[in-house]
Amino acid sequence: MFTLADISFRSRLLMGTGKFTTKEIMLQAITAAGSELVTLAMRRVDIKGGNDAILPTLRTAGVKLLPNTSGAKDADEALFVARLAREAIGTNWIKLEIHPDMQYLLPDPVETLKAASKLVKDGFVVLPYCSADPVLCRRLEEVGCAAVMPLGSPIGSNQGLKTKDFLQIIIEQTQVPVVVDAGIGAPSQALEALEMGADAVLVNTAIAVALDPVAMARAFSLALAAGDLAKSAGLAERRKYASATSPLTQFLSHYEVCK
């Protein structure tokens, strides 16, 4: 269990809702994953209520919705989308995403920090997607973000924890929850993030594009459950040198006597 803002979640797996072939498969995958916090791109929501299908579907899942500002290219656009989400969905929670580079979808650190500061002052619970930059994460924490969401690797790349060394520093230094977001392509990578000390992970592409998204969602859920249990059990310390599991001193002393 971990806490974001004032809400506790049993599952450490946050899920994205893009790239699924059907709404039904998306819903089944959310259920299989056991996710309680699900992201939703505002650009996919028909705010006029005409042919919007995804929002009613997600509301039947009984999960907390986390709208995001995906598609925003600067702070002003992100502020507009966040306020639209608050009005349309009725939540002050927002996943802040600003990535003007459409090839790599890397977050803009300057605009992200600027937008985060304004959104917090406007009463939002802000969860910013950001680069794995320890200094930036400290700044985001200082302006009042409820968590930081540093990337493991580029969005949808399935490359895993390419930023592992920097993620470790962020986990050590940051006082708010750390949710590793983007690039996680396998359950083992999600497990590794938890074993490093991350509070949760957000996964979308690896589940949505799998041959069997529902089974893959379940696989991620099991991996994170194992990681959570291992974390609470206390992982053995890593050592540079070998450490014998059974001392041989007494046995060898007996050998010397027999000679």
Curated annotation (Swiss-Prot):
- The answer to whether the entry has keyword Endoplasmic reticulum is no
Catalyzed reactions per annotation? [ThiS sulfur-carrier protein]-C-terminal-Gly-aminoethanethioate + 2-iminoacetate + 1-deoxy-D-xylulose 5-phosphate = [ThiS sulfur-carrier protein]-C-terminal Gly-Gly + 2-[(2R,5Z)-2-carboxy-4-methylthiazol-5(2H)-ylidene]ethyl phosphate + 2 H2O + H(+)
Q: What is its EC number?
A: 2.8.1.10
Instruction: Give the matching InterPro entries.
Output: Aldolase_TIM (IPR013785), Thiazole_synthase_ThiG (IPR033983), ThiG (IPR008867)
Q: Which UniProt keywords apply?
A: Cytoplasm, Schiff base, Thiamine biosynthesis, Transferase
Biological or metabolic pathway of the protein: Cofactor biosynthesis; thiamine diphosphate biosynthesis
Query: Sorted alphabetically, which Pfam families does this protein's record hold?
Result: ThiG
Cellular component terms (Gene Ontology)? cytoplasm
Residues engaged in binding 1-deoxy-D-xylulose 5-phosphate: 156, 182-183, 204-205
GO MF terms here are:
thiazole synthase activity
List the subcellular locations.
Answer: Cytoplasm
Q: Name one GO biological process term.
A: thiamine diphosphate biosynthetic process
Where along the chain is the active site annotated?
A: 95 (schiff-base intermediate with dxp)
Subunit organization: Homotetramer. Forms heterodimers with either ThiH or ThiS.
Q: Which family does it belong to?
A: Belongs to the ThiG family.
Q: What does this protein do?
A: Catalyzes the rearrangement of 1-deoxy-D-xylulose 5-phosphate (DXP) to produce the thiazole phosphate moiety of thiamine. Sulfur is provided by the thiocarboxylate moiety of the carrier protein ThiS. In vitro, sulfur can be provided by H(2)S.
Protein name according to UniProt: Thiazole synthase
Give the originating organism.
Baumannia cicadellinicola subsp. Homalodisca coagulata
